[in-house]
């Protein structure tokens, strides 16, 4: 098999739902990233085999294709959009790597985009053309069959109850996420990932959801989202707008084009779990991935596990025995945000910039009861 390597990765700063990016369609969120890669790597961009993007709540119509055309890329580049719900961005990266492995191509752009602020309203179609009732709006897409399809909040509560995760534990983890994200934004670690761009004439270069002044006392005052529950808006991620792009390339082609550093794709795993406990999807996914490579969690230097809810991250950490000092060391989605279709690609982007970590894992729990995970190693091409 051919060896895929990631030689470039960038994201925009993530906006809050209804925040500074609320007026921008997904294509506009991607455009500065496409332009950046075109400016920085014109030869690479002229040789692209495909663009593979994750997207979950967009307008449909193959957003990857439309976005690359809007950005002025060659019409000969096809484009494909992937929907594995919030695992879509990670799946896009995995699929690009698999395409390189198989020899189907040598250079791909992978990533994801989401605008929760611009997500279209969806209406149930009437059974009869003569139906006169008011239209029924879908609050969200169904993830599983009726009776086994909890809301995200219900699923997070299910995990908290099953694995005995207390309210205090969840609040503590959320506080940790904001503190680490704030620290690593200020020291320049997270800033490496972000491509600043102008929004209504002003530079946008910091994630809107990070709360550096957040306290445990403030978190403790928040009411549970469900009666007698433990999940709150404070120990959950926000809805966000954002975009991420990475360049995936065959190793020898990367050397030919002068690239000498990045991360190489080793393997991946995707596993189904009970939809009621979707948040612990990372557990079987990571276990399967490690078993395939004959590794243990002790062989992994850093793990990026998407923070949809504190409860599911804590449960997954405990079940996988991940040392806390290896988990989401720069903070996670509870602080920086969760633009669904882009989040998995953002995890890989973070690993790309953790240059002192050799062997790393990105993993996510996914709506409908799925976990996916990917293993990477630091790559030096010289």
From Swiss-Prot:
The keyword Isomerase does not apply. GO terms for molecular function: acetyl-CoA C-acyltransferase activity. Its EC number is 2.3.1.-. The keyword Methyltransferase does not apply. Pfam families: Thiolase_C (PF02803), Thiolase_N (PF00108). PROSITE patterns: THIOLASE_2. GO terms for biological process: fatty acid beta-oxidation; phenylacetate catabolic process. Keywords: Acyltransferase, Transferase. The active site is at 86 (acyl-thioester intermediate), 338 (proton acceptor). InterPro entries: Thiolase (IPR002155), Thiolase-like (IPR016039), Thiolase-like_sf_Thiolase (IPR050215), Thiolase_C (IPR020617), Thiolase_CS (IPR020613), Thiolase_N (IPR020616). Gene3D superfamilies: 3.40.47.10. GO terms for cellular component: cytoplasm. Belongs to the thiolase-like superfamily. Thiolase family. This is Putative acetyl-CoA C-acetyltransferase VraB. It comes from Staphylococcus epidermidis (strain ATCC 35984 / DSM 28319 / BCRC 17069 / CCUG 31568 / BM 3577 / RP62A).
């Amino acid at each position: 098999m051919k060896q895929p390597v990631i030689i470039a990765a960038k994201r925009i700063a993530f906006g809050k739902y209804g925040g500074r990016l609320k007026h921008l369609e997904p294509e506009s969120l991607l455009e500065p990233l496409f332009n950046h890669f075109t400016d920085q790597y014109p030869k690479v961009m002229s040789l692209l085999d495909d663009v593979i993007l994750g997207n979950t709540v967009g307008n449909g119509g193959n957003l990857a294709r439309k976005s690359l055309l809007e950005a002025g890329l060659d019409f000969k580049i096809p484009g494909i959009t992937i929907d594995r719900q919030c695992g879509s961005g990670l799946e896009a990266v995995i699929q690009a790597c698999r395409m390189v492995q198989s020899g189907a191509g040598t250079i791909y752009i992978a990533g994801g985009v989401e605008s929760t602020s611009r997500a279209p309203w969806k209406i149930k179609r009437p059974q009869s053309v003569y139906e006169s009732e008011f239209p029924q709006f879908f609050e969200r897409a169904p993830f599983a069959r009726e009776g086994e399809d909890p809301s995200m909040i219900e699923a997070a509560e299910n995990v908290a109850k099953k694995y005995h995760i207390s309210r205090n534990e969840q609040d503590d983890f959320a506080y940790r996420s904001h503190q680490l994200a704030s620290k690593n934004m200020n020291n320049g670690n997270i800033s490496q990932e972000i491509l600043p761009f102008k929004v209504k004439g002003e530079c946008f270069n910091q994630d809107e959801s990070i709360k550096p002044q957040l306290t445990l006392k403030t978190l403790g005052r928040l009411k549970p989202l469900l009666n007698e529950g433990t999940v709150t808006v404070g120990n959950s991620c926000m809805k966000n707008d954002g975009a991420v792009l990475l360049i995936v390339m065959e190793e020898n082609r990367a050397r030919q084009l002068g690239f000498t550093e990045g991360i190489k794709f080793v393997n991946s795993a995707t596993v189904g779990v009970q939809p009621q406990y979707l948040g612990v999807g990372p557990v079987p996914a990571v276990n399967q991935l490690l078993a395939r490579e004959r590794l243990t969690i002790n062989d992994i230097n850093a793990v990026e596990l998407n923070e949809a809810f504190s409860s599911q991250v804590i449960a997954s950490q405990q079940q996988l025995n991940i040392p806390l000092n290896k988990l989401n060391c720069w903070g996670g989605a509870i602080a920086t945000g969760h633009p669904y279709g882009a989040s998995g690609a953002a995890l890989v982007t973070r690993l790309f910039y953790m240059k002192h970590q050799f062997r790393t894992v990105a993993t996510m729990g996914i709506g409908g009861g799925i976990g996916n995970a990917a293993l990477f190693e630091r790559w030096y091409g010289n």
